[in-house]
């Protein structure tokens, strides 16, 4: 029996949470905005996306996630407009915008000080703000000591251009080195039922250091919403069509994971996406998932995940469906940008002034 028609209570309350230990407070679920402008097919109509963001903020989801490489640049412009419109409508609501730097429009990774500063200035301009709430290094430049990149970010904090610093796809050792220069507020990682390798070192390191965890792609890039049939519905220019897990030889085997999750969702009276998202929420009060969508209906369904309760036995059962030996295919293809597995940087002693 399919669970598509069943939903958890639509009026789920979106609680607030402390993200990290530096004072940042956000909604316990965020909104990933990438797909509104880039990567997942063609750019969506601006008016529709502004309406979606306003709907999200009115519902209590006030933590918006973007990056300068989405578009490139157009997603930041959209989020800036939409966030401002939402804030104007919901006068007592504080909208937090997180953006990122480090991936150039040519899909190269850079973390040198001059680039960091120029990227920040560009994001401030496109977002239409005087200060960025949370500024992530999107990917780690393996040619620049992370201390050098962090040093420039620290200056930007001191100048009032950013409030909090984050890292994305960073290893535990890189996180530790960066945190010495300036406290890291949040680390963004891919964390979902079928992407759990971060649990060994990265998650414990974040918790040891008081760093919040932002889980991107918590629905497996849409896989846990509709399973293998998702790929048949994607346009040719959708990024997911190139990913190993979505290739026919892997997708056929991964389809069984979705079917088991979907069956459990039917038993619990929720959708498969709500169940998978609830699993991420149950990882701890320091974890903020940021599912993305371009449809208000899907957004409402995602918020409903906050009302889904899971027992320890149910958590274990879900995890058994998507254990490491069951999931077929890597997260990215081998030629893609740096992930946390290749985010180590040279020692600080190797850097010379003027590099």
From Swiss-Prot:
InterPro entries noted in UniProt: Aldo-Keto_reductase, NADP_OxRdtase_dom, NADP_OxRdtase_dom_sf
UniProt binding sites for substrate: 138
Domain of life of the source: Eukaryota
Q: Does the keyword Cytoplasm apply?
A: no
The UniProt entry's sequence similarity note says:
Belongs to the aldo/keto reductase family.
Q: What Enzyme Commission number(s) apply to this enzyme?
A: 1.1.1.-
- The name on file for this protein is Probable aldo-keto reductase 3
Task: Give the organism, scientific name.
Answer: Oryza sativa subsp. indica
What are the record's GO terms for cellular component? cytoplasm
Keyword list, A-Z: NADP, Oxidoreductase
Its Gene Ontology molecular function terms? aldo-keto reductase (NADPH) activity
Give the residues the record marks as binding NADP(+). Answer: 217-227
| Active site: residue positions | 70
Pfam families attached to this UniProt entry: Aldo_ket_red
